[in-house]
């Protein structure tokens, strides 16, 4: 655990994510919790640490102000509740943080904002300037305008992308659970807490995480997936019980609580990280055993010869998933060809592409520079 203590001491830019299940009660926003959160983040801020807060809670905050009998069972209803709740949530954040001498800013994003490289860079520049000004950005999904196919799905996913945007060196995820367990503690009384996870990629997340919170859109699976992504980026994750009193202050004072997830020794480039996670894959490429070995052990590009099946329709330049014959996900990457052309050239040597398509702009189906292995989808 000494590495954990040292990393906490050396952290200069932290992304803190707080979920709806922590932030709200049946009556609405938990004002006492926001006050304690502001107090703890102010202490870190005074030490010179940059803080970025990814906050859920807008829909839950607006729930009590919708008409009696109205249900939040479709996207327009959730968007309307979010529009009500977001302003109330930010008002409470602004008022509370100001009492501790902190200035906050509201940043609302959609997945489309991070999908396009120019808008991604614009978001990065804006957040960088806010942090230079010692302002605390409070980030949430822009639920009111997000369409279903471009939703982040949950703020754990959003937070995992923000780690890359702001170049954070620590990720703290405040949840309703007291860290990570070897299996779902709600269903298994003998579940054991995990104080430290050395290699998150070796875990069977589907078996460990089979439930979600009542008021949130995510669950432990989404939190572990976000931690998996953070590990690839070289960022450690700390999953804590957000309702534990002054929990952030206590762990920075050396108390060992929650679950510490160790990052990969060799991190991926920020560009590859963005390529892999800016949107969902548009299709699958099924590859043979030889291609699988070349990818996993040789760091090679994916050649058409190793592809045995194409699933889905996609354009050249779109993100696709690479799977083996058993359906296991191996990687994601940008396809050099559209799905129609891939079907024509799969199983063929690269030297045969021109005779089949009439042109050969690329000898590979996915170049290794545009390929991320073990993507946490």
Curated annotation (Swiss-Prot):
Keyword set, alphabetical order: Amino-acid biosynthesis, ATP-binding, Cytoplasm, Kinase, Nucleotide-binding, Proline biosynthesis, Transferase
SMART domains: PUA (SM00359)
CDD domains, per the entry: AAK_G5K_ProB, PUA_G5K
GO cellular component, one term: cytosol
Catalysed conversion reaction: L-glutamate + ATP = L-glutamyl 5-phosphate + ADP
Location of the PUA domain: 282-360
Main location: cytoplasm
Amino acids binding substrate: 56, 143, 155
Protein residues bound to ATP: 17, 217-223
Pathway(s) the chain acts in: Amino-acid biosynthesis; L-proline biosynthesis; L-glutamate 5-semialdehyde from L-glutamate: step 1/2
One Pfam match: PUA
GO biological process, one term: L-proline biosynthetic process
Keyword Transferase: yes
Keyword Transmembrane attached: no
Molecular function terms, GO-annotated: ATP binding; glutamate 5-kinase activity; RNA binding
Class of this enzyme: transferase
Taxonomic superkingdom: Bacteria
Compartment(s) where it occurs, according to its Swiss-Prot or TrEMBL record: Cytoplasm
Function of the protein: Catalyzes the transfer of a phosphate group to glutamate to form L-glutamate 5-phosphate.
Similarity-based family: Belongs to the glutamate 5-kinase family.
HAMAP family named among the record's database cross-references: ProB
Name of the protein this chain belongs to: Glutamate 5-kinase
């Amino acid at each position: 655990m000494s590495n954990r203590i040292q990393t906490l001491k050396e952290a200069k830019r932290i992304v803190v994510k707080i979920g709806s299940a922590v932030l709200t009660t049946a009556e609405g926003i938990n004002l006492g919790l926001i006050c304690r959160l502001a107090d703890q983040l102010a202490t870190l801020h005074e030490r010179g640490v940059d803080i970025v807060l990814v906050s859920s809670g807008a829909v839950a905050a607006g729930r009590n102000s919708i008409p009696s009998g109205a249900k939040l069972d479709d996207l327009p209803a959730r968007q309307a509740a979010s529009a009500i709740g977001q302003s109330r949530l930010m008002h409470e954040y602004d008022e509370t943080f100001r009492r501790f001498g902190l200035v906050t800013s509201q940043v609302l994003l959609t997945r489309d904002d991070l999908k396009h490289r120019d808008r991604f860079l614009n978001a990065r520049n804006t957040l960088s300037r806010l942090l230079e000004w010692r302002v605390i950005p409070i980030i949430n999904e822009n639920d009111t305008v997000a369409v279903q196919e471009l939703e982040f799905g949950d703020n754990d996913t959003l937070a995992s992308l923000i780690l890359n945007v702001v170049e954070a060196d620590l990720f703290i995820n405040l949840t309703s659970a007291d860290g990570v367990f070897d299996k779902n503690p709600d269903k298994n009384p003998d579940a054991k807490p995990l104080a430290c996870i050395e290699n998150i990629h070796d875990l069977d997340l589907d078996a460990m995480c089979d439930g979600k919170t009542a008021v949130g859109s995510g669950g432990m699976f989404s939190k572990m997936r976000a931690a998996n992504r953070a590990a690839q980026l070289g960022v450690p994750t700390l999953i804590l019980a957000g309702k534990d009193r002054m929990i952030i202050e206590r762990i920075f004072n050396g108390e060992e609580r929650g679950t510490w997830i160790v990052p990969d020794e060799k991190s991926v480039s920020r560009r590859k990280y963005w390529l892999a996670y800016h949107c969902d894959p548009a299709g699958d490429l099924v590859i043979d055993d030889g291609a699988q070995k070349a990818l996993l052990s040789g760091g090679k590009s994916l050649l058409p010869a190793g592809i045995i099946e194409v699933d889905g329709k996609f354009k050249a330049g779109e993100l696709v998933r690479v799977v083996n014959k058993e359906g296991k996900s191996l990687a994601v990457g940008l396809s050099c060809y559209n799905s129609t052309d891939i079907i024509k050239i799969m199983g063929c040597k690269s030297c045969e592409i021109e005779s089949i398509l009439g042109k050969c702009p690329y000898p590979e189906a996915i170049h290794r520079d545009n390929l991320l292995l073990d993507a946490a989808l």
